[in-house]
Design a protein with these regions (language model features):
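Charged, glycine/proline-rich intrinsically disordered loops and linkers
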Residues: 37-54, 119-137, 200-233
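Signature of the catalytic double-stranded beta-helix
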Residues: 53-128, 132-144
Length: 311
């Protein structure tokens, strides 16, 4: 299997893209992406943590290989996505895992990053994303890392909003998919390949004052509105909103050959590493939600380029 595959462009991405497009309205509202990484579990030493909350919202349409909303099976079992993943990774074993969607208002370019990892025995089904990110950044769990195909498709014809990526690493040239996107998708390994969203809009739009509790939804009149505490914080025409679909699938040849991780095993590995480094710490009673513990791991295993796997 090739672990750093060359991205494959898929066109057309969907037989009926209009059906996918209408799902965004039907499945609203969507929560702010910031709710996936609450402020108290961000690395406060990073400049990124000091930025206001961007108008970036997310929803889950499929999880654990099962659709969560009507119509998600059209994406989860998309034959073109499956065939591209087989070709890119050189395997016949592709198991769709989840479908997530991103809804973005006008905003600055996001920080270059890689996506949130998964491990055998530790996935987003049972583990919070900040904990999975620090597992990935530590390099201590590579033997258990799930190799995944990532396929992104977009619904946006406005200004900016590019998908920028570095298939040869950050020292190599940047490539971009640009608006108007049309019925296309890109299959790659976004858990390993650095990428970002470019500036959405013309760069002069005023950012709404929102927190992680904000939501976005259509207003029934052709616009999308951001709501928080019962107040409308921003209103956008539909054409100003960038919609994208993220499909993930495990790819492998046969049995991965490793026992699945347990939380006890993960903690054994983390604590042994901290002792080896000579770092004082207290073992938390609930390591998945203990903020000081996760912040300690973030500081020890900080990656100055990666802002937290937002795609």
């Amino acid at each position: 299997m090739r672990f750093n595959p060359k991205p494959i462009r898929i066109e057309p991405a969907f037989d009926h893209p209009g059906k996918i497009r209408t799902m965004f309205e039907r499945c609203a509202p969507y929560r702010a992406l910031a709710t996936y990484a609450p402020e108290g579990i961000k690395d406060e030493a990073h400049e990124q943590a000091m930025r206001p909350v961007d108008p970036w919202f997310r929803g889950d349409w499929a999880l654990g290989g099962e659709p969560l909303v009507d119509g998600a099976d059209l994406i989860l079992h998309n034959k073109r996505f499956l065939e591209a993943a087989k070709d890119a990774f050189g395997t016949s074993c592709v198991n769709p895992e989840f479908v997530a969607v991103n809804i973005n208002g006008p905003m600055p370019a996001c920080t270059t990053h890689v996506d949130n990892p998964s491990f055998y025995g530790a996935t987003r089904v049972d583990y919070p994303l900040p904990f999975l990110r620090v597992m990935g950044g530590s390099g201590l769990f590579e033997a258990w890392r799930v190799v995944r195909a990532s396929t992104l498709s977009w619904f946006y014809e406005g200004a900016g909003g590019s998908f920028d990526y570095w298939p040869e690493g950050l020292d190599g040239p940047m490539r971009s998919e640009q608006s108007p996107f049309g019925n296309v998708a890109l299959c790659s390994d976004n858990d390993q390949m650095y990428h970002r969203i470019g500036t959405i809009g013309n760069g002069t739009e005023e950012m709404p004052r929102i927190s992680a509790s904000a939501k976005i939804q259509p207003d029934g009149e052709g616009n999308w509105i951001i709501l928080e505490n019962g107040e409308i914080r921003a209103t956008y025409p539909r054409h100003a909103i960038r919609f994208s679909v993220l499909w993930k699938a495990e790819v492998r040849n046969g049995n991965p050959g490793v026992d699945h991780l347990t939380l006890d095993r993960i903690m054994e590995i983390f604590t042994a590493d901290l002792r080896h480094r000579g770092i004082d710490f207290q073992v938390p009673s609930d390591p998945l939600t203990d903020t000081p513990w996760i912040l300690l791991l973030q500081r020890v295993h900080a990656n100055p380029t990666d802002s937290g796997g937002k795609q």
